[in-house]
Amino acid sequence: MIQMQTILDVADNSGARRVMCIKVLGGSKRRYASVGDIIKVAVKDAAPRGRVKKGDVYNAVVVRTAKGVRRPDGALIKFDNNAAVLLNNKLEPLGTRIFGPVTRELRTERFMKIVSLAPEVL
């Protein structure tokens, strides 16, 4: 469950290390984002010589949450951290690699590229 001001780890090699959610996209009163939702983020910590720099604003898709995601069979998939993958304006991933596992809920038309790059899909 991601809301405004939430700090997330970045699960790609775009150069950002940590980002902060500044808006949950999808409706004017929308408060929370979960796995697979698109959020607007500001880069808070970036690696030197990376593709992004501190202060940049990007779209991102949430790939892991500590709150978890409930499956129709009743299983609950939780993670140790909240993580996101940075996206460009066409909603394509900025990085060329994905670090850590992602959930099967990302297997939609929009995020198949992220699923194919991920080392593990839960």
UniProtKB/Swiss-Prot annotation:
Q: What is the lineage of its organism?
A: Bacteria, Pseudomonadati, Pseudomonadota, Betaproteobacteria, Neisseriales
Instruction: Note the InterPro entries from the entry.
Output: Ribosomal_uL14 (IPR000218), Ribosomal_uL14_bac-type (IPR005745), Ribosomal_uL14_CS (IPR019972), Ribosomal_uL14_sf (IPR036853)
Q: Which UniProt keywords apply?
A: Ribonucleoprotein, Ribosomal protein, RNA-binding, rRNA-binding
Checking HAMAP family in the record gives: Ribosomal_uL14
- Further details from the record: Present in outer membrane vesicle formulations which are used as vaccines in human.
A Gene Ontology biological process term: translation
Which family is this protein grouped under?
Belongs to the universal ribosomal protein uL14 family.
Subunit and partners? Part of the 50S ribosomal subunit. Forms a cluster with proteins L3 and L19. In the 70S ribosome, L14 and L19 interact and together make contacts with the 16S rRNA in bridges B5 and B8.
What protein is this chain from? Large ribosomal subunit protein uL14
Concerning CDD domains, the annotation shows: Ribosomal_uL14
For molecular function, the Gene Ontology terms on record are: large ribosomal subunit rRNA binding; structural constituent of ribosome
State the GO CC annotations. Answer: cytosolic large ribosomal subunit
Q: Does the keyword Nucleotide-binding apply?
A: no
Q: What does this protein do?
A: Binds to 23S rRNA. Forms part of two intersubunit bridges in the 70S ribosome.
